[in-house]
Regions:
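N-terminal active-site beta-alpha-beta segment that forms phosphate/nucleotide-binding
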Residues: 1-76
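Conserved phosphate- and dinucleotide-binding cores of soluble alpha/beta proteins
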Residues: 49-50, 56-222
Length: 222
């Protein structure tokens, strides 16, 4: 399914475009399609080291995010997306960089298989919250007051919790029920010391959804 999804995404790319790419297996397939296709002068911006290395191995030009102010289109996966194109992007802990890439894109497209599409976000995944170190305890207490179970994310092979490339800790805030996704994201983002969250609300222009039978469905923003 991931390959079919990537093939549908490839058809949206034109010669000379500067595109944003996230991480994950579907993006790896998309890189292969770009490499095998007839497109010229494609440049890539990505927050993912694995994606950057894959592009380099296929001879695709990668430019730093800080040198770019706009992108023609950007593609990324997510943990879950709803029919209104609200998405949770908690897994990679690079959501701040991913949001920057999404904001620069004229069109931001999510690539998912049908198992990740829900009518309304269920929050089976926690909301990842990046915070400046000095605000760690304060932000944790504020999230707990909002009803979340909060933990500093840990990773295998590392002593202590996960830190971003910018040196900021990442908290996982688990919510049981959320009635208003946009309101939740605003409340968390307004806490002093919060850098960003993994909730993407009102950002995606469309989602390309791969079905088990090999077909793809495109959902446009309402």
């Amino acid at each position: 399914m991931k390959r079919e999804c990537a093939e549908a995404a490839y058809k949206l790319i034109k010669n000379g475009m500067t595109i944003g790419l996230g991480g994950g297996r579907t993006i790896q397939y998309l890189i292969e399609f770009i490499n095998m296709g007839n497109l010229d002068q494609i440049k890539v911006v990505t927050p993912s080291m694995s994606t950057a290395l894959a592009c380099k191995s296929h001879g695709i030009t990668v430019i730093p995010t800080w040198l770019t102010s706009s992108l023609d289109i950007a593609f990324d996966g997510c943990d879950q997306v709803d029919e209104s194109l609200n998405a949770l992007k908690s897994g990679g802990a690079i959501h701040t960089q991913e949001r920057i890439v999404a904001a620069m894109a004229k069109q931001y497209v999510l690539l998912v298989d049908s198992s990740k599409l829900v009518q309304k976000l269920t929050f089976d995944y926690p909301v990842a919250v990046e915070v400046v170190p000095e605000a760690f305890s304060y932000v944790k207490s504020q999230l707990e007051k909002m009803g979340a179970q909060v933990a500093w994310r840990t990773g295998s092979g590392k002593d202590g919790g996960v830190m971003t490339d910018q040196g900021n800790p990442v908290m996982d805030a688990a919510f049981n029920t959320v009635d208003d996704v946009a309101a939740l994201n605003r409340r968390i983002s307004d806490i002093p010391g919060v850098v960003d969250t993994s909730l993407f609300v009102g950002i995606a222009a469309k989602a390309i959804v791969a079905q088990p039978d090999g077909t793809v469905t495109v959902i446009d923003r309402p």
